[in-house]
Curated annotation (Swiss-Prot):
Annotated site residues (Breakpoint for translocation to form KAT6A-NCOA2) in this chain: 869-870
Motif (LXXLL motif 3): 745-749
Motif (LXXLL motif 2): 690-694
Positions of the bHLH domain: 26-83
UniProt organism field: Homo sapiens (Human)
Keyword Secreted assigned: no
Name listed for the protein in its UniProt record: Nuclear receptor coactivator 2
Gene name as annotated: NCOA2
Length: 1464
């Protein structure tokens, strides 16, 4: 073997070597050479033989060593014998198929006659051949098993006679050659055989009894079987029996396995046309016919009946109310209404209608309505209610801010549910209730999902939900969200246990639906419960889970339970959120308000439910819900419902816990078991709640009401009364929802002090409060609870437990894919953009920074993290889900109050605050965004009705947010616009419907404003907001725009301080809760009406502050917030954007205007920053109002720009680039620098020439704006570019940039470096960091990199400084950079105010920088300057407390954050 070993590897080489060496070594011995050669050859062949033998037998182990020749030969002989024996056996049995391991012999050929039957027998389908004409040439006999047709019936018939119409095209593609059918799916070469697999629906032969029926009936009864066809097209060369089979399609059709069956669309829809009187003129059900879902005729019939029927407690039917809305707004979404089919299937429906006008005369001609239906199908009815698509659109308005809505749009049942909830509030229109639910539910924004996820978490299904929508429910983002998660538990328990109509499977589906479904499930279950208050009561008594589930019957109790239950660690906020979420689900549908709906809603939020029952909008929803649910409940039996509630509630209870949420979240069924783990505590909680409920509702009358509700009597009102009623059930005054609303608001305000109390205290107190207050009050209380708890959570009253819950939630979020799906969603975004630790740290920081603003500050921080993330995502959702759904926002406005009180405070405390003055409605709208999202939605929904709830809603929100106060009022008006901001075009229509007062500017603000900015604005802008509460809805829309509107929202200051008090003296979380409560109470009283707000503003000197220092304040806050936001979340743009907007806003006394201005100016910035989310395009929100001013400003700016065309072009280009390619940096920083430098020189010359003139103009305009107040500023704020922005979200930025750039030029003139900065802004658009460095002014002003950071944050800020285009940014950078320099600081302040004023006028902005230096120095500048440095020094401020006096600090913070960002 030695020879073999030596040479086998390369015998040829060995032989050559041997020839050369042999003569020398061995001598001339031919014999020896021959022997060696033979040996080598022998070794070689044996080795090859070994390889063949062992390789053939896959005896790989034998390759590890070299076998000896004997072994190899032995194995070879053995194998040859085996082969011969096998051949003999095969010869004996010719028909026997050869063994697979025998490869040496030829394949056995099966006789063709035997092969056919064998194949057919083995086939899992039938075989058919279709020729080029589409005729069936052959079909196998077994077709009868599948289609009931005989072979003879199909032979030589057209295949299209049995194919569904919708599949003809696909079949033709497969039948005809690629050359004939363009875009054919064949991928193989034409001459080769091609195979393809496709699905098609084939007609099943009708049964004999149906053949006699008429054609129509027969068509209706047609049944199609979805078959999977494997088709092979034969090449031309194949001919058989003279027949050309070249174009034949040979197919094998088999039934699609259940697991492979495509998921049927979760929603169905049909369209109707109505005349202007609302009478149906035509009905189109073709889409439902094509869907082939059984019972669609009954579905259409019952939907129309439900929509047009007048329900108890309602003055008009859904159809009538909706028709009026359509005629008024041009586009409207109805509230979600529910009904049941003849088979008991629950259906959630929503109608979207559009007014069609004549193209020539523009006169209304008719109304086209799309009715979207979602069947329950063993899932929580809420899911059907939500009908991913059906609810999605309506929800979109609300949901536009909320991932839940997005989910809904996506059509996930779970998500649908959540969306449904959201919509309910906007649709329900109970301002308080709706807004609140929105706030809580939508307030969740991302939280919405959180609540959905977390709420669903309790339900086994719900957790599955969570898997789908973790980002939605990012709990970390919203400490209050954890409550939301708990709330889902509530839902879960009703869904799983409490809803006879909706069996656990329902919940399971809900769970699978996703977190939103969880919410929906909750609602669905709630419905079950709602039908009987008694059941709900019992459920509550039986367990927290039930309380959540049965919270339908007693939302308040549910809240209480959540709070009481172990889940309460974080649950107090979660409870609130959950309660809201649960209610939201129902609220969305609005039906819960009635009967089952009432209970469901009540379970979610007592107050809210009441609101639903309120005459506003909820009644309709509630009645529907009550109808559908009551039917289900009645059909299944109250007893069963009660049993479900009692039994499942225990299981579900644990789910409220954060851990339970996480666990349940992980598996949809897990929720039940998870809740089971918490069963003991939940039982205790249940008993406590029941005890309290009994105590609170000690009167037999209350119990009787509950019983009546349980029995389905007076369900709507009673359920709402009982629903809040576990605790407040009895006390609820179902009869007077409005009164309750006010009472609830009052109660919330009065109980505001609990807000600051530690979470543990708050939970019981809130619970108690809930029980004590009226149903409306309960709802408010719940909202308050949420907010208070959230507040306390934010401040870190219970950092340990809250953090634990938060961590769990964050884990869930991080583990789920939702964050990826909804990176922008509040919950998801926080999880995605900021790691869990960062969020927790922020939360801790908030608690640690218990500065006067702590409640707000903490909230802000949390919001900054969660809301900013949420906000950004939400706008994205809004844009994606509800781009054209301004109407939904309007709908949302109907229930602004609901949102107001929501936890959003903690979630997006700034947002929350904003909605407060605006109304809960605002929050309702902004709710999705977080609080802001809810607010926004609520505002939109309640915009029109908002006057009715203003003070009440404000009060609750104010108390809840504590900082919101009057300022939010105007915000609320604007939320509609903000809500529409997602869909700028739609936004504008929306705005009219909400409130004339609402600033379109606001929308613009909303669009531009990022969560961070919103938060930042909480400080200074608060005043502005408050100053213009009536008109200044703009700030709310900002909030609503979860986009990067934080900055804008910050303008409002609302988010920051609900009350002027907060603004003036930062609402210190440090202050005792009682003090804060007292302040809130006072604020509530003061803000009860707009006059009071205005008086307060005047007393506080807010108008002056707003015009002067506030502008700066907002900027500072904006910068800080922006910085924080940037630090916390990936998108730097929001910060930059926010900071700039904030400055502008801050300077503008009117928040709207500043917001608008910021939007206008910032749009380019926003665009730059918004690259990651071009959908935000805040400028698109700018409305027509400011058009004149904007146009004037634009003309001025353009005139100036004409001198500097290059710069202007660049700015425009940058904006355009951002818009077109948001992800791509606009231009290289170097280019921007070069341009900036050149333009700086040119512009400096022009500016110096015009400097004095421009400054004078700017000053005059600033004064004018201040004098005019916020009303004027919005129009002014909206530059000409802005209006364009409003109309076209993408263009707006370019327009805004256009406008801002002229100001930039002006600013450029002012400071040389600044001007470079102006060019730089263009560069920052492309490369903010470059912009900073490029802008000498910026760098100079901020000698330290910190300033550059603001510049980075305000990448444009420098540019703005250079060119007043972005006053807010410019001024904030100055402040931040030169916080120490009082002159600069002053300059910045003036700049800010001027910026806001010149927001609409670029030229003014240009001068602003210069003028600012001179005039702004006067008031806030010096103060701000000093403040700025101080705050900058305080890292805590950076973290969470960005208050009015922190503007410079904010800038500094921005600088720090930006610098870090820049230089990292």
């Amino acid at each position: 073997m030695s020879g073999m070993g030596e040479n086998t590897s390369d015998p040829s080489r060995a032989e050559t070597r041997k020839r050369k060496e042999c003569p020398d070594q061995l001598g001339p011995s031919p014999k020896r050479n021959t022997e060696k050669r033979n040996r080598e050859q022998e070794n070689k062949y044996i080795e090859e033989l070994a390889e063949l033998i062992f390789a053939n037998f896959n005896d790989i182990d034998n390759f590890n060593f070299k076998p000896d020749k004997c072994a190899i030969l032995k194995e070879t002989v053995k194998q040859i014998r085996q082969i011969k024996e096998q051949e003999k056996a095969a010869a004996a049995n010719i028909d026997e198929v050869q063994k697979s391991d025998v490869s040496s012999t030829g394949q056995g050929v099966i006789d063709k006659d035997a092969l056919g039957p064998m194949m057919l027998e083995a086939l899992d389908g039938f075989f058919f051949v279709v020729n080029l004409e589409g005729n069936v040439v052959f079909v196998s006999e077994n077709v009868t098993q599948y289609l009931r047709y005989n072979q003879e019936e199909l032979m030589n018939k057209s295949v299209y006679s049995i194919l569904h119409v919708g599949d003809h095209t696909e079949f033709v593609k497969n039948l005809l050659p690629k050359s004939i059918v363009n875009g054919g799916s064949w991928s193989g070469e034409p001459p080769r055989r091609n195979s393809h697999t496709f699905n098609c629906r084939m007609l099943v032969k009708p049964l004999p009894d149906s053949e006699e029926e008429g054609h129509d009936n027969q068509e209706a009864h047609q049944k199609y079987e979805t078959m999977q066809c494997f088709a092979v097209s034969q090449p031309k060369s194949i001919k058989e029996e003279g027949e050309d089979l070249q174009s034949c399609l040979i197919c094998v059709a088999r039934r699609v396995p259940m697991k492979e069956r495509p998921v049927l669309p979760s929603s169905e829809s049909f369209t109707t046309r109505q005349d202007l009187q609302g009478k149906i003129t035509s009905l189109d059900t073709s889409t439902m016919r094509a869907a082939m879902k059984p019972g669609w005729e009954d579905l259409v019939r019952r939907c129309i009946q439900k929509f047009h029927a007048q329900h108890e407690g309602e003055s008009v039917s859904y159809a009538k109310r909706h028709h009026h809305e359509v005629l008024r707004q041009g586009l409207a979404f109805s509230q979600i209404y529910r009904f049941s089919l003849s088979d008991g299937t629950l259906v959630a429906a929503q109608t979207k209608s559009k007014l069609i006008r004549s193209q020539t005369t523009n006169e209304p001609q008719l109304v086209i309505s799309l009715h979207m239906l979602h069947r329950e199908q063993n899932v929580c009815v809420m899911n059907p209610d939500l009908t991913g698509q059906t609810m999605g659109k309506p929800l979109n308005p609300i949901s536009s801010n909320s991932p839940a809505h997005q989910a809904l749009c996506s059509g996930n049942p779970g998500q649908d549910m959540t969306l449904s909830s959201n919509i309910n509030f906007p649709i329900n229109g109970p301002k308080e209730q709706m807004g609140m639910p929105m706030g809580r539910f939508g307030g969740s924004g991302g939280m919405n999902h959180v609540s959905g996820m977390q709420a669903t978490t309790p339900q086994g299904s719900n957790y599955a939900l969570k898997m789908n929508s973790p980002s939605q429910s990012s709990p970390g983002m919203n400490p209050g969200q954890p409550t939301s998660m708990l709330s889902p538990r509530h839902r879960m328990s009703p869904g799983v246990a409490g809803s006879p109509r909706i069996p656990p499977s329902q919940f399971s589906p809900a769970g699978s639906l996703h977190s939103p479904v969880g919410v929906c499930s909750s609602t669905g279950n709630s419905h079950s419960y709602t039908n009987s208050s008694l059941n709900a009561l019992q459920a509550l008594s039986e367990g927290h889970g039930v309380s959540l589930g049965s919270s339908l019957a007693s939302p308040d109790l549910k809240m209480g339970n959540l709070q009481n239950s172990p889940v309460n660690m974080n649950p107090p906020p979660l409870s609130k959120m959950g309660s809201l979420d649960s209610k939201d689900c129902f609220g969305l549908y609005g039906e819960p308000s009635e009967g089952t709906t009432g209970q469901a809603e009540s379970s979610c939020h007592p107050g809210e439910q009441k609101e639903t029952n309120d005459p506003n909008l909820p009644p309709a929803v509630s009645s529907e819900r009550a109808d559908g649910q009551s039917r289900l409940h009645d059909s299944k039996g109250q007893t069963k419902l009660l049993q479900l509630l009692t039994t499942k509630s225990d299981q579900m209870e644990p789910s409220p816990l954060a851990s339970s949420l996480s666990d349940t979240n992980k598996d949809s069924t897990g929720s039940l078991p998870g809740s089971g783990s918490t069963h003991g505590t939940s039982l205790k909680e249940k008993h406590k709640i029941l005890h309290r409920l009994l105590q609170d509702s000690s009167s037999p009358v209350d119990l009787a009401k509950l019983t009546a509700e349980a029995t389905g009597k007076d369900l709507s009102q009673e359920s709402s009364s009982t629903a809040p009623g576990s605790e407040v059930t009895i006390k609820q005054e179902p009869v007077s929802p409005k009164k309750k609303e006010n009472a609830l608001l009052r109660y919330l305000l009065d109980k505001d002090d609990t807000k600051d109390i530690g979470l543990p205290e708050i939970t019981p107190k809130l619970e108690r409060l809930d029980s004590k207050t009226d149903p409306a009050s309960n709802t408010k209380l719940i909202a308050m609870k949420t907010e208070k708890e959230e507040m306390s959570f934010e401040p870190g009253d219970q950092p340990g437990s809250e953090l634990d819950n938060l961590e769990e939630i964050l884990d869930d979020l991080q583990n789920s894919q939702l964050p990826q799906l909804f990176p922008d969603t509040r919950p998801g975004a926080p999880a995605g953009s900021v790691d869990k630790q960062a969020i927790i740290n922020d939360l801790m920081q908030l608690t640690a920074e218990n500065s006067p603003v702590t409640p707000v500050g903490a909230q802000k921080t949390a919001l900054r993290i969660s809301q900013s993330t949420f906000n950004n995502p939400r706008p994205g959702q809004l844009g994606r889900l509800l781009p054209n759904q301004n109407l939904p926002l309007d709908i949302t406005l109907q229930s602004p109050t609901g949102a107001g009180p929501f936890p959003p405070i903690r979630n997006s405390s700034p947002y929350s605050v904003i909605p407060q003055p605006g109304m809960m409605g605002n929050q309702g709208m902004i709710g999705n965004q977080g609080n802001l999202g809810n607010s926004s939605t609520g505002m939109i929904g309640n915009s029109a009705s908002r006057p009715t709830m203003p003070s009440g809603e404000w009060a609750p929100q104010s108390s809840a947010v504590r900082v919101t106060c009057a300022a939010t009022t105007s915000a609320m008006n604007r939320p509609v616009q903000g809500g529409m901001i997602r869909n700028p075009a739609a936004s504008i229509p929306m705005r009219p419907s909400s409130q004339p007062g609402q600033r379109q500017t606001l929308q613009s603000q909303v669009m531009n404003i990022g969560p961070s900015e919103l938060e930042m604005n909480m400080g200074g802008p608060q005043y502005s907001q408050q100053q213009a509460p009536p008109n200044q809805t703009a700030p709310w829309p900002e909030s609503i725009l979860p986009i990067d509107q934080a900055s804008f929202a910050s303008q409002n200051r609302q988010p920051f301080g609900s009350s002027p008090d907060d603004l003036l003296c930062p609402h210190p979380a440090a202050e005792s809760p009682s003090d804060e409560g007292a302040l809130l109470d006072q604020l509530y009283l003061a803000l009860r009406n707009f006059d009071g707000l205005e008086e307060i503003d005047r007393a506080l000197g807010i108008p002056e502050l707003v015009s002067q220092s506030q502008a700066v304040d907002p900027e500072q806050f904006s910068s800080q917030d922006s910085n924080i936001m940037l630090e916390q979340k990936a998108p730097v743009f929001p910060q930059q954007y926010a900071s700039q907007a904030q400055m502008a806003q801050g300077s503008y006394s009117p928040m709207q205007d500043p917001n608008f201005h910021t939007m206008g100016q910032r749009p380019s910035y926003a665009t730059l920053r918004m690259q990651p989310r071009p959908g935000l395009r805040p400028t698109g929100l700018v409305q027509n109002q400011p058009n004149q001013l904007r146009l004037q400003l634009q003309h001025r700016l353009q005139a100036q720009q004409n001198r500097q065309p290059l710069m202007n072009q660049i700015s425009n280009v940058s904006n355009v680039n951002l818009t077109l390619r948001p992800g791509v940096p606009t231009q290289a920083p170097i280019n921007a620098q070069m341009l900036a430098q050149r333009q700086r020189e040119i512009l400096n010359q022009h500016l110096r020439q015009r400097q004095m003139h421009q400054q004078q103009q700017v000053q005059q305009r600033t004064l004018m704006m201040r004098g005019q107040g916020l009303n004027m500023t919005p129009s002014m704020v909206a530059p000409s570019g802005m209006p364009a922005t409003m109309s076209n979200p993408r263009i707006p930025q370019a327009n805004a940039q256009q406008f801002p750039f002229p100001p930039n030029y002006g600013i450029s003139q002012q400071p040389d470096p600044g001007f470079t900065g102006a060019t730089t802004p263009q560069s920052p658009l492309m490369s903010p960091r470059m912009a900073h460095t490029q802008s000498p002014m910026m760098q100079q002003s901020q000698a330290n990199p910190a300033y550059q950071a603001p510049s980075d944050i305000n990448g444009w800020a420098q540019g703005n400084m250079g060119g007043n285009s972005m006053f807010s940014q410019q001024s904030p950078p100055h402040f931040g950079q030169q916080a120490n320099t009082s002159m600069y600081s002053n300059n910045m302040n003036i700049n800010v105010s001027m910026a806001t004023n010149t927001g609409g006028m670029s030229s003014m902005n240009q001068m602003t920088g210069q003028i600012s230096m001179t005039s702004v120095t006067s008031v806030p500048t010096s103060g701000l300057s000093s403040m700025g440095p101080e705050q900058v020094n305080d890292p805590a401020l950076r973290g969470g407390n960005l208050f009015p006096n922190q503007l410079p600090g904010m800038d500094m913070i921005k600088q720090e954050g930006d610098t870090t960002r820049k230089y990292c």
